[in-house]
């Protein structure tokens, strides 16, 4: 305690160390931060529910006491080294920030490319310095997001003028949806307004088409917990919660169960190929989408929407990719009802989400290319983690050598 300007007391749960003649207070403080101190402290802990130490524990500790002049030298040297560490840390943060800004600037040139030739030119510029640009997890994640953005904009693979345009595909899906409504297999919904010019985030390539999310999927809510189910025959089933539905993958580490009426099991059944979309949570959770890719029976909670694709011509993984893109995330952020740190969307807002649909053959090519890029990014991350681990081992070895 330095320069205390007023009379003060200390609480009973604190231990006061008074100044002792021939000891430098700063040296004592250095000792109190050392491994030698903490090792002795842990060995002297009493109690299990709430571990604690007392003055007797401190009294029994071994305290290495050098001559006064050496204490002063130690304090001076430690302070010099700590200042150096702070400077290195600050320099590292500045370098990382500058590096990330450079990466983001160069990646933006890719998404801003006006044509395939310009994209190839900008990519070549990045490729020349690939090993020096993508050396952090943040830069690799930025690369991954840029590739995703290029994919949904139709800039990842060249267009083939011989491909059937997406407009023809959407006509067939509309006919099939109308038949399903007529047969009573899906409910007819109140029509939504068409996509406005303000809602279109970018210009589509030739052969692509904008549609509403509800144009290609039948959206259903899930099981509501806490219902009165007295005198009904129940079965116990597993169900999916918001925590299970991540952005582009499933987290099935903890799958809970719920009782529902036996006659409702088909209503809430999630089948392979269904899309799962989160209703809410924190602002970054809203609209999180993944594909159910398993054969076993499971249902969805009411905070997770189920989207069943109409027909079999649209790849569910394309819709998953687009719904997780920056454009859909921006849509959900603007459409959602937001309170402090929380946000949610309703079924109507999900129905009205604009989606870009490419020709079927092009969608297949995009997904193959996207998977290749994602695998590359994961390999880069593993190599980076391995290199960082090696650096840590080397630093530990050098530190041990210096100490010993």
Q: What is the predicted role of each segment?
A:
Residues 17, 23, 209-239:
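Extended boundary segments
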Residues 6-15, 46-65, 297-305, 314-317, ...:
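A short glycine-rich beta-alpha junction/loop motif
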Residues 164-168:
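Terminal amphipathic helices with adjacent charged low-complexity linkers/tails
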Residues 68, 72, 83-104, 108, ...:
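Non-catalytic DNA-recognition/assembly elements of restriction-modification systems
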Residues 1-3, 194-199, 214-229, 243-275:
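Sequence-specific dsDNA recognition surfaces
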Residues 1-11, 33, 229-237, 249-259, ...:
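Short, surface-exposed loop/turn microsegments at beta-strand edges and helix-strand junctions
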